[in-house]
Amino acid sequence: MAKKVAVIGAGVSGLISLKCCVDEGLEPTCFERTEDIGGVWRFKENVEDGRASIYQSVVTNTSKEMSCFSDFPMPEDFPNFLHNSKLLEYFRIFAKKFDLLKYIQFQTTVLSVRKCPDFSSSGQWKVVTQSNGKEQNAVFDAVMVCSGHHILPHIPLKSFPGIERFKGQYFHSRQYKHPDGFEGKRILVIGMGNSGSDIAVELSKNAAQVFISTRHGTWVMSRISEDGYPWDAVFHTRFRSMLRNVLPRTAVKWMIEQQMNRWFNHENYGLEPQNKYIMKEPVLNDDVPSRLLCGAIKVKSTVKELTETSAIFEDGTVEENIDVIIFATGYSFSFPFLEDSLVKVENNMVSLYKYIFPAHLDKSTLACIGLIQPLGSIFPTAELQARWVTRVFKGLCSLPSERTMMMDIIKRNEKRIDLFGESQSQTLQTNYVDYLDELALEIGAKPDFCSLLFKDPKLAVRLYFGPCNSYQYRLVGPGQWEGARNAILTQKQRILKPLKTRALKDSSNFSVSFLLKILGLLAVVVAFFCQLQWS
């Protein structure tokens, strides 16, 4: 059984991994290369090598009730979508509540993680770190890699002939912090993911003109969904997930297309994906269509060539006098402290069992946490990964044979390509609810709906038709939390609480309003029949 566990990184995945280690009675030590927790969500004015970077205005794309850890709801007065500083505040509250800071060695860089000579029998690792210029060695029974995958910028300059002639400024979106200094400029943003769209919208408020280039187009969703509820609280239900799994693919694609076009017609805005039958991750942005309507942003096709001052696009159009090019072209990822044979990265892909475990190790004592991109919140996903991993380390859960794991990796990759395509940005993509259930099943934390229908039908209905959030995985099994049921039944109140900033009359007036509507309808019917009688 693993006892001493090295956790690399004190971002979201690192913090929840620490807690899961403590919950299972393991002895974690976390190595964080910077001076504080939070990882990518801790904004800093300057870009730092080896550290994820965000712009000052970043707001979460997943809502608080769908993003909180399973036994620690966010404060009810927190907004539904959080500015990065507010999310960091939650992580600080979380770390303090569970006393996690004492396990973290700050300003400590992991230089290497190597198998011990007797690894085949012990499963142990030699971890070399550096702090204040001094190297230290330590042996650990297991390692959790939580270093993230938004550190190494991907800038495919060879795909942009003429970039060497371009006289303006160009840089990766990782270096963008705020709109200051870009006033009155003509700006080209290459790439229309979440970051590219956010940056284009923000710059368009004061720039002379913003262009955004997209190779394949994209669906754009608002954070606001039916009846004003957060999109993910509506989209991610077990019922809807079941429909997407059992209906024919063509029907599912048609439904998704109709849903995406309900807000605005993507074809009219030049955004409709070329292959709209691939379930590409949509962009979450509330302002893109508005800025397009205002002409502040213009959608362009793929850049064919760049000159000293202009951009030539594949459709033959040319935009002159470009001052700035921002490459919002995503990230590559690597693990420089690991031997290539441990977690091999090829074409921005890794072969890991359930996106977590290398399949070829004699002992399953190395795991990657958070190296995934679900169509939902990463926080509950990383938590379930860590809960399973720590139980594997402890010997309470076991993995199948190497052959079985490799077959799963191959089939999972084929399914991913079939659903999401082969783009580099989609290599870590997976279905949200299905993946959470898969992990929960491994540790015995998936709720039994048939049983609940008889024992607690009210809760069963909420689980199936309501938001599929992390509390569901604390109802049963190891780590069961007595507050889980109440958290599920009261989540609507926490969603609405931060919106109740203006005193209104009691909501019971709704019933009076409804009654008046019924009476009005009856009056219309009576008037109609009276008219027939007199005619």
From Swiss-Prot:
InterPro entries per the UniProt record, alphabetical: FAD/NAD-bd_sf (IPR036188), Flavin_mOase (IPR000960), Flavin_mOase-like (IPR020946), Flavin_mOase_2 (IPR002254), FMO-like (IPR050346)
GO CC terms, sorted: endoplasmic reticulum membrane; membrane
Compartments where found: Microsome membrane; Endoplasmic reticulum membrane
Signal peptide stretch: none
PTM-bearing positions, type N-acetylalanine: 2
GO MF term list: flavin adenine dinucleotide binding; N,N-dimethylaniline monooxygenase activity; NADP binding
TM ranges: 510-530
Cross-link Glycyl lysine isopeptide (Lys-Gly) (interchain with G-Cter in SUMO), where in sequence: 492
UniProtKB keywords: Acetylation, Endoplasmic reticulum, FAD, Flavoprotein, Isopeptide bond, Magnesium, Membrane, Microsome, Monooxygenase, NADP, Oxidoreductase, Transmembrane, Transmembrane helix, Ubl conjugation
Cofactor field: FAD; Mg(2+)
Sequence positions that bind NADP(+): 60-61, 195-198
Broad EC category: oxidoreductase
Entry keyword Methyltransferase: no
Taxonomy, superkingdom: Eukaryota
Gene3D superfamilies: FAD/NAD(P)-binding domain
Function: Catalyzes the oxidative metabolism of numerous xenobiotics, including mainly therapeutic drugs and insecticides that contain a soft nucleophile, most commonly nitrogen and sulfur and participates to their bioactivation.
Record's protein name: Dimethylaniline monooxygenase [N-oxide-forming] 2
Gene that encodes it: FMO2
